[in-house]
Amino acid sequence: MNKKNIITILLALVAILSVSIILKGQGNETKSAEAKPKYATEQKKTQDDAVLTYDISSLQDSASLIILVIREYDQQGMVDEMKGQRLKMAKTLSIGFSPRQSVQSDSIVTVYVRPDSRNGLARDLVLKPVPDAPETFYLYEKVPIQVSALRPNTFIPLAFYGSFWWDSNYKTCRFCGEKELTEENIKESDYFKYSPHYYIIGAIFSDNTARVIPL
C-alpha cells in the first residue's frame, strides 16, 4: 500500500469519527430538551395583576368585622379550613401573594389580606409539587373570583390559588381556563376539574352576632 492510499484512509477515518461525535452530541441535546417540561397558561391578564382589590363598601352598614377564611382542597374535596383573626370593617379589601408568582423551587407562598391601607394579615400556604411531572415543580397561579352579591355572615370566595396540572399528551404543565371566575361557574371551571391542589381565599363579613352560613 503506497503512502497516498494510507493518507486517504486516515482522512476517511477522521471524517467518520467526527460525524459520530457530532451525531452523539445532537442526540444528547434532543434528549435533554425532551426531558424539560413546558408550561401552558392562558392567564396573561391575571398574571400581570400583583394585587386583587375588592370594593366591600356596600357592607359597611351591615357588618363590622372581616374574618379571613382560607379553604384548602384536593381532588377529593376540602381538606382543611383556616380562619384568621378579625379585622375592622373597611371600604376595600386587597389580596396579594409573595412571591408574586410561585417559583418552581418554592414550596411555600405567603398570602396577604389588607383592609383599606391598614395593616392586615399574612398566612403561609404550603404548596405541593405537580403530580406526574418528570421533575419536582411547585407551579401555582391566582384567579380572581367575581362576587355577584356581598352578603353578611356568609363565606364569600374572593380568589382561587391553584396548582398547574401535568398534561401527559403534550408533556407540559398546564393552567388554562377563565381569566376570572364567578360564583356561578366556580364549580364548573377546568381549574376545579384538573388542578390537583388549590386554595380558596375568602372572607366572612360579620356583624359579630349571627351564625355563619357555609358556602
Residue ranges and their predicted role:
Residues 27-84:
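Start-of-domain marker
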Residues 60-142:
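Structured domain cores in non-transmembrane regions
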Residues 3-4, 33-34, 107, 183-188:
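Polar/charged alpha-helical tracts
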Residues 3, 99-102, 164:
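Assembly/interface hotspot detector across virion components, adhesins/toxins, and nucleic-acid enzymes
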Residues 114-205:
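Mature extracytoplasmic/lumenal regions of exported proteins
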Residues 207-209:
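Short A/G/S/P-biased low-complexity tracts
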Residues 213-215:
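Short, solvent-exposed mixed-charge patches
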Residues 1-32:
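Bacterial Sec-dependent N-terminal signal peptides
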